[in-house]
Amino acid sequence: MNRLPTCLLAATLFLGSASLYAEEPACARVRLADPGWSDIAVTNATAAFLLESLGYQVKIDTLSVPIIYGGLRDGQVDAFLGGWMPAHQDYHDKFVASGQVERLGRNLDGTRFTLAVPRYVWDAGVHRFEDLAAQGQRFNRKLYGIGSGAPANQSIQKMIDANQFGLGDWKLVESSEQAMLAELGRAEKRQRWLVFLGWTPHPMNIRHDLRYLEGGEQYFGDRGQVYTLARKGYAAQCPNPARLLANLRFDLDMENRLMSDALEGTATPASATRAWLKANPRVLEAWLQGVTSRDGGDALAAVRGQP
């Protein structure tokens, strides 16, 4: 009797209709990770709403980026929707390229993550990384980053350690995303000079008049992508939720809008997501392609039936 090769069988389990296979009890709960970033809050909220509509339980743990990658490797985290590239290149090389963590798919294109300054600093002539050192006193020789352990912070520290762009005597200030943006707000009120980590998608691009510095591609890369990652073997063990997570595709406008609604208005990431999906129902057909409810039912009907 002919036997399917192991790799073909694994692909069939993932790509075929998940309802044809008995799902392991461990798949009933999907464990996601959140590094405390606004973009991942809204993409996690989207994934959680869809998964819960299909009959799954969702647990979201707030963890630092190094702990998230370690959790994926050790099987303590099922999936992470925040694999920013090239910002996470070192983590990719250590965990993904080595086969300890798997990629389910790319969920966003066109991202940017690099140092930025307020518009009034740009107008004064600071356009490139090379322009910073000459104005060190005005910047108080500080580069404002985000949470400790973030890959972007590591890139800044490498730049300082190498005295790149003459920044060897500068200091990295690590804080949460929210604290960094609060510092930006205070600086803007006083027209104080500040250089900080900026990125898109994020409502900071709407709320603040900022400009991205040029010339830092060696450390921050150019336009990037965000990938959905999973623990090794997750797609084979839990093909239905893995298929949904692999199907998720976002765009910059959607994420900026959802984050703005959640951060500036009265909406939470979850309520902002539901409102967006009700206004944009056609996206569900692509996201739910090849997916069923946990009991094998119609996924589209299950999601559309939610209040």
Where are these regions (language model features)?
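A conserved helix-loop-strand patch within extracytoplasmic ligand-binding domains
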Residues: 99-152
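Ligand-binding cleft/hinge of the Venus flytrap
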Residues: 47-54, 136-170, 278
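Ligand-binding pocket segment of bilobal, Venus flytrap-like solute-binding proteins
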Residues: 77-81, 151-218
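Immediate post-signal peptide segment of exported/extracytoplasmic ligand-binding proteins
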Residues: 21-31, 134-140, 287, 302-306
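C-terminal functional modules
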Residues: 108, 251-307
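A bilobed periplasmic-binding-protein/Venus flytrap-type ligand-binding module shared by bacterial periplasmic
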Residues: 112-123, 225-237, 261
